[in-house]
A protein has these predicted regions:
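Ankyrin repeat boundary/linker residues
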Residues: 15, 56-57, 90, 123
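Conserved ankyrin/ankyrin-like repeat signature
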Residues: 33, 75, 107-108, 140-141
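Acidic, negatively charged sequence tracts
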Residues: 2-25, 91, 147-238
Length: 238
């Protein structure tokens, strides 16, 4: 009630044409309004906003695609935090990374990579985000995606090697204790290098991976060799 005792009129929120509350917030670049939808129990969109976070529009774009196209970095991070699927693709195989790459939105690309978006996702033309960036001459994006791929390749090699070593069905009887220690220590060393080297270049990651493979691959090759059958005891004569 107002001081005069009259009921205060409720302000009616009008969304932009052909939008949901989510895409409305993206187009208006109003991150606070989006947060309010999720966190304010009295908000009129509180019960429906989660269903809209990945809903594609008539143009086939998800909210994250729209944010990526417009270069909305903070909005993209908020969408991801609220459940936007960074792996989501449209019927032609385009994901948010393709849109960010096409429009040269480097900040959004970084946010998507941090959220572990798939660098290898291809559209119907066989293009990853990197190739899309290259086609539109977005050099900074190409360089960043090369850097990100080199880093991910190194980390993935470390991870798969560690998983292989932890699988007794694969390594039992094939690797010596020394072999296992070499793998464990070398993987740990490279993982720690990634963690502490904040200014690593694309070439640095490639060089580190090659050095790791040089040590690890000869040992892992033993896993492809046939196991020697234990010799059976000789039978006694009758």
């Amino acid at each position: 009630m107002t001081p005069e005792g009259e009921q205060e009129e409720k302000v009616v929120e009008i969304l932009l044409p052909n939008t949901t509350i989510v895409t409305h917030c993206i187009l208006k670049n109003d991150t606070q309004r989006l947060v309010k939808c999720f966190e304010d129990d009295e908000d009129e969109y509180k019960d429906t906003v989660a269903e809209l976070i990945n809903q594609r529009g008539e143009d086939g774009k998800s909210p994250l695609d729209v944010a990526a196209t417009l270069g909305r970095v903070d909005m993209s991070r908020e969408l991801i935090q609220r459940g936007a699927d960074v792996m989501s693709v449209n019927c032609q195989g385009y994901c948010a990374m393709h849109h960010a790459a096409a429009w040269g939105k480097l900040g959004v690309l970084k946010a998507l990579v941090e959220a572990q978006s798939d660098l290898q996702q291809k559209n119907v033309h066989g293009e990853r985000a990197r190739e899309t960036a290259l086609r539109y001459n977005k050099t900074e994006c190409v360089d960043f995606l090369d850097w990100a791929e080199a880093k991910v390749d190194l980390l993935n090699f470390i991870k798969t090697t560690q998983e292989t070593l932890a699988d007794p069905d694969k390594v039992q009887g094939r690797l010596s204790k020394d072999d296992k220690n070499i793998i464990t220590n070398t993987c740990k060393e490279k993982a720690e290098w990634v963690e502490r080297t904040s200014d690593a270049t694309t070439k640095d990651f490639i060089t580190q991976k090659m050095a790791l493979e040089e040590v690890i691959n000869p040992i892992l090759q033993k896993l492809n060799e046939p196991l020697e059958s234990p010799q059976k005891g000789t039978k006694k004569g009758k």
